[in-house]
Every structure is written in C-alpha cells, then in structure tokens.
C-alpha cells in the first residue's frame, strides 16, 4: 500500500497484483560445487567457503550500501578463499571458464541456466524481495473502457502466474537461444 501510494503521488500510476516473480540478488554455484559439496542454501557455504572463489561485478564490492560483499559475508559468516571482481559483461564467461566457483546473480537471469548454475536458497533472507508487478498509469482503464472493458480484469489474471523458474527460462530463450 505504501509503495502503491508513492507511485501514485510521484508518477500518476498504480500497481496491479504481483505476477509471482522475485528478481532479487541470488547466489549461484557451479555444478562442480554442487557435485562436491551439495549445498542447498547460502548458509551451507560457511564451512566450505575457504575452499571457494567468489566472483561478482565491481559494484558488489563497493563500500556504499547494505547489499554488498562486506555485509553479505559478515551476515552469513563466509570467508571465501578469494573475492574476484569482474566486469559485469564478463562474469558469466568467467564462471564458465572456472575463474571462480560462487557468483552473485539475479534470480531470473537466463544466463544462470546457460552457465549451469544452481541458485542457492537465501535461508536467512539477506537480499530483499524485488517483486514483479504490472504498473499502469492513472486513467488507463477509463480511457479504454469502450474498446477494452475487461482490460483491468484481464491484466489481473497475470497475478501469481509466473515463477522465477519460468521467467529464467523465458530470459534464457531471449539471451541465449
């Protein structure tokens, strides 16, 4: 309600229901890590982090902000063997080539599938939710009442219809195929 009110005040728009996607930051691990250690959640990395190399784009290592490398490793009690900065455009190439074992990703990125990454559960909820919603301008449904009287109800049908897995597959088809 708060966010919807702010969007209305600032942009003259409103949100419809959540479509079911949470494109938050996530932690992806390689198949080799899965085969050797079988982690299911980020907490599972704590006892093995010293054997793993962590990679992320430069922005993840900056001091400003709470969702950065320092607060992340402190929150989960992780001490990686090495923390590697990589250009955001090269991070998937780098993990596929074996430059590191663990990487910060977006949950719905199709390149996660291409790199054969497993997304670990954020079992302590470090990363905030980034829920996907449809946003429409004020007056949209009134403007289309004659031509599309069911527009609002039709768009509301999308509420809860997507998952991160579905969205990841769709972005994979766009980014890779």
Model-derived features with residue positions:
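Alpha-to-beta junction loops
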Residues: 1, 49-52, 94-105
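Beta->alpha turn/N-cap motifs
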Residues: 1-2, 29-31, 88, 102-111, ...
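Ligand-binding "clamshell"
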Residues: 2-16, 99, 111-125
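Periplasmic-binding protein-like
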Residues: 6-14, 147, 157-177
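Short Pro/Gly-enriched coil loops immediately N-terminal to beta-strands
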Residues: 17-26, 122-132
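Bilobed "Venus flytrap"/periplasmic-binding protein-like clamshell domains
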Residues: 20-92, 164-165
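A bilobed periplasmic-binding-protein/Venus flytrap-type ligand-binding module shared by bacterial periplasmic
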Residues: 24-35, 131-147
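Solvent-exposed loop/turn segments at secondary-structure junctions
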Residues: 32-35, 59-63, 108-111, 139-142, ...
